[in-house]
Swiss-Prot record:
<dbReference type="GO" id="GO:0005938">
    <property type="term" value="C:cell cortex"/>
</dbReference>
<dbReference type="GO" id="GO:0099164">
    <property type="term" value="C:postsynaptic specialization membrane of symmetric synapse"/>
</dbReference>
<feature type="domain" description="LisH">
    <location>
        <begin position="172"/>
        <end position="204"/>
    </location>
</feature>
<keyword id="KW-0007">Acetylation</keyword>
<dbReference type="GO" id="GO:0008360">
    <property type="term" value="P:regulation of cell shape"/>
</dbReference>
<dbReference type="InterPro" id="IPR006595">
    <property type="entry name" value="CTLH_C"/>
</dbReference>
<dbReference type="GO" id="GO:0099003">
    <property type="term" value="P:vesicle-mediated transport in synapse"/>
</dbReference>
<feature type="repeat" description="Kelch 1">
    <location>
        <begin position="284"/>
        <end position="330"/>
    </location>
</feature>
<comment type="subunit">
    <text>Homodimer; may form higher oligomers. Identified in the CTLH complex that contains GID4, RANBP9 and/or RANBP10, MKLN1, MAEA, RMND5A (or alternatively its paralog RMND5B), GID8, ARMC8, WDR26 and YPEL5. Within this complex, MAEA, RMND5A (or alternatively its paralog RMND5B), GID8, WDR26, and RANBP9 and/or RANBP10 form the catalytic core, while GID4, MKLN1, ARMC8 and YPEL5 have ancillary roles. Interacts with RANBP9. Part of a complex consisting of RANBP9, MKLN1 and GID8. Interacts with GABRA1. Interacts with the C-terminal tail of PTGER3.</text>
</comment>
<dbReference type="InterPro" id="IPR006594">
    <property type="entry name" value="LisH"/>
</dbReference>
<keyword id="KW-0963">Cytoplasm</keyword>
<dbReference type="InterPro" id="IPR015915">
    <property type="entry name" value="Kelch-typ_b-propeller"/>
</dbReference>
<dbReference type="GO" id="GO:0098895">
    <property type="term" value="C:postsynaptic endosome membrane"/>
</dbReference>
<dbReference type="InterPro" id="IPR011043">
    <property type="entry name" value="Gal_Oxase/kelch_b-propeller"/>
</dbReference>
<feature type="repeat" description="Kelch 4">
    <location>
        <begin position="469"/>
        <end position="515"/>
    </location>
</feature>
<dbReference type="GO" id="GO:0098982">
    <property type="term" value="C:GABA-ergic synapse"/>
</dbReference>
<feature type="repeat" description="Kelch 3">
    <location>
        <begin position="408"/>
        <end position="458"/>
    </location>
</feature>
Length: 735
């Protein structure tokens, strides 16, 4: 008997031999075959296109069909203007029919780059015989394209590839039949539809959608159709659609409950450079320290979300064996053990000496309300020197703390006087909370090696508790604003560069030079970034605005959820302050990933007329997608709108009554757009049948065509696995 517990070994990924099959052009001695050999020190060992006019391409033919998993590009030993800044890769079993496998770009350096190619459809691997590389843009504007070396890797074991090839052929045939079925049904060719389905036994869609089509398109039973849609929503079938919709931000200012008459002493005052953490289990926000414009603070507060109330835990933590007054420090919370850690601070050059420059490290126990000094000087214990504007993350599972970056404070001269001494930045450290020991994981490095990381200040660092990676991006190093983005796997000690910041994705990623506050949602695999005001006076513009960005970790893509309408000064009657927080820096943002709410407090609004001004406003931010209830109401509206239009043709009086009652209740009358659309519907009562535009289906009656159009709209809310194919048969006809 075979070993029951044995796991099948993963198929081996190996280099795939190929030959040059076709090319668009080449110039002089820069032949396509040159990409078969890797000679980084030979400037002539490359393919170069004759021009940069599209389409330029190379088609590679594999020795035999294979699952092509990766493509590697070799380069010249120096940067080169002809390197590919943007390119696409396509693949397929024949050169006439290819699928896009990759859209990316190369860095303009000498390092080889490997990219993963799309090689699965619905989790099933598919084979390719041909690979087409299409250059789109070179690093030097208007230069010809050059490719120095190409390597393909994947699986070409016939025992694995052949079943994939069989599946792929069957899949293509099945999709072709489904396109025919869709076409026949749209045109009401009932006999042809039924005959093809009976013969092939291939389903066009999930039975539930067939049921909806039957009730809606064939029978016009709108009530039954609504019931089926309601069942679909309640069964969670619209969840996938909801997860793909863009967020809309909803800010609301929090006005905490006041217990005393004066109302001043029972909430934190104005400040910037403070720190906040949140206990998501108890829904409590903890706030400590900061700078009020004239002095550092040592007060410690807790805000209960449930009670909507601030409680002052301590007016001065130093008096309770805790940290002294400070700002630009960092805090992190261990929710499992209910403990808060704080490290670092900013010290003015006038008060710096060998004693004050020691980096103390404290832990606060929430349940016993006590502070404990873990270290008088972390540098003496193998940890970081005294730093400010660093970042700190907690790994509760392994009981570890990670701290990275920050400016090291020194005795000599002012921090701003770069001539007195080159600024020093702190590396990446790990603190084992159990053993109370520090370990240096990465020193600050300016080298561009694959495992090197560059220290910085004012950056973002987040810990993903599920994939166990730190994510680091942005920040500043001396006068340079950084926009690279990398992850660090804490278990394998490996750095992965997500973006080196050289690609000009202007407008597609958060801008550098602005204060960024970031949070992470490990469950949704999302990083959230609030971009505010620049600390740099020269960079501060009058029309500065907040923007909120979301990075999708799985899709490796940024999206901007909103940029505020800088409306306060353009429209004095509308105060921006009432709707959302004004742009600022030195503020704090925390995220409750359990209840999906952000909390923001205080900061510096950067008013040159009042440089000491600090804020004490408190806000919550919810990122909202369409709810199930909204989608159900919207679907009912679409169905009833269509029903009304049908009635309007037959019985205008009955239609008017239907409009005023049944259709009216599916509209949100507080929404101006919905209200306007609803008001325009009445015009249907005065249209003749010929006024309606059909789908262009000359062979089906108007009602059938309109109902089919409504059905196609409703289908969009269902998961792709349930729906008919997205394309149309007629679209395959080329002129």
């Amino acid at each position: 008997m075979a070993a029951g517990g044995a796991v099948a070994a993963a198929p081996e990924c190996r280099l795939l031999p190929y030959a040059l099959h076709k090319w668009s052009s080449f110039s002089s001695t820069y032949l396509p075959e040159n990409i078969l050999v890797d000679k980084p020190n030979d400037q002539s060992s490359r393919w170069s296109s004759e021009s940069n006019y599209p389409p330029q391409y190379l088609i590679l033919k594999l020795e035999r069909p294979a699952i092509v998993q990766n493509i590697t590009f070799g380069k010249y030993e120096k940067t080169h203007v002809c390197n590919l800044k943007k390119f696409k890769v396509f693949g397929g079993m024949n050169e006439e029919n290819m699928t896009e496998l990759l859209s990316s770009g190369l860095k303009n350096d000498y390092n080889k780059e490997t990219f993963t190619l799309k090689h699965k459809i619905d989790e099933q691997m598919f084979p390719c015989r041909f690979i087409k590389i299409v250059p789109l843009l070179s690093w030097g504007p208007s230069f010809n394209f050059s490719i120095w070396y190409v390597e393909l890797s994947g699986i070409d074991d016939p025992d694995i590839v052949q079943p994939c090839l069989n599946w792929y052929s069957k899949y293509r045939e099945q999709e072709a039949i489904r396109l025919c079925l869709k076409h026949f049904r749209q045109h009401n060719y009932t006999e042809a539809f039924e005959s093809l389905q009976k013969k092939t036994k291939i389903a066009l869609e999930h039975p539930m959608l067939t049921d909806i089509h039957d009730k809606l398109v064939l029978k016009g039973d709108f009530d039954a159709c609504e019931e089926l849609i309601e069942k679909a929503v309640n069964d969670g079938l619209f969840n996938q659609y909801i997860s793909q919709q863009e967020y809309k931000p909803r800010w609301s200012q929090i006005i905490p409950k006041s217990t005393k008459g004066d109302g001043e002493d029972n909430r934190p005052g104005m400040r910037g450079g403070h720190q906040m953490v949140i206990d998501v289990q108890t829904e409590t926000v903890y706030l400590f320290g900061g700078w009020d414009g004239t002095q550092d603070l040592a007060d410690f507060w807790a805000y209960s979300v449930k009670e909507n109330q601030w409680t002052c835990i301590s007016r001065d933590t130093e008096k309770e064996n805790g940290p002294s007054a400070r700002s630009c420090h960092k805090m992190c919370i261990d929710i499992q053990r209910r403990q808060i850690y704080t490290l670092g601070r900013y010290l003015d050059s006038s008060v710096r000496n060998s004693k004050s420059l020691k980096s103390d490290f404290y832990r606060y126990d929430i349940d016993t309300n006590t502070w404990m000094l873990l270290s008088e000087d972390t540098a003496a214990d193998g940890g970081p020197k005294l730093v400010f504007d660093h970042q700190m993350c907690m790994d509760s599972e392994k009981h570890m703390i990670y701290t990275f970056g920050g400016r090291i404070l020194t005795c000599n001269g002012s921090v701003d006087d770069s001539r007195a001494s080159e600024p020093q930045f702190s590396g990446l450290f790990a603190f084992n909370c159990q053993c109370q020991t520090w370990k240096l994981l990465r020193e600050d490095s300016c080298n561009a090696g694959p495992e090197d990381i560059q220290s910085r200040i004012g950056h973002c660092m987040l810990f993903h508790s599920k994939n166990r990676c730190l994510y680091v991006f942005g920040g500043q190093r001396s006068k340079t604003y950084l926009n690279d983005f990398f992850s660090y796997d804490v278990d394998s000690d490996h750095v992965d560069i997500i973006s080196d910041g050289t690609k000009k994705d202007s407008g597609m990623v958060p801008m550098t030079g602005f204060t960024q506050r970031a949070t992470i949602d490990p469950e949704l695999n999302e990083i959230h970034v609030l971009s505010g005001l620049s600390k740099d006076k020269e960079k501060r513009e009058e029309n500065v605005r907040n923007s909120f960005w979301i990075y999708d970790i799985v899709r490796n893509s940024w999206s901007c959820v909103y940029k505020n309408d800088q409306a306060a000064k353009d429209n004095p009657t509308k105060s921006l302050q009432e709707e959302e927080p004004c742009p600022r820096f030195a503020h704090q943002l925390v995220y409750d990933e359990l209840h999906k709410v952000h909390y923001l407090f205080g900061g510096n609004p950067g008013k040159s007329c009042s440089p000491k001004m600090r804020l004490d406003d408190f806000w919550s931010l919810k990122l909202c997608r369409p709810s199930k209830d909204y989608l159900l109401r919207h679907c009912k509206y679409l169905i009833r709108k269509h029903r009304f239009e049908e009635k309007a043709q037959m019985d205008p009086l009955s239609a008017l009554k239907y409009l005023q009652n049944d259709l009216y209740i599916t509209v949100d009358h507080s929404d101006p757009e919905e209200t306007k659309e609803f008001q325009l519907l009445a015009s249907a009562l005065f249209k003749s049948g010929s006024d309606f535009t059909a789908l262009g289906f000359s062979d089906v009656d108007h009602t059938y065509a309109q109902r089919t159009q409504l059905f196609d709209t409703l289908v969009n809310f269902f998961p792709d696995s349930m729906t008919p194919p997205k394309g149309n048969l007629v679209d395959l006809i080329t002129l």
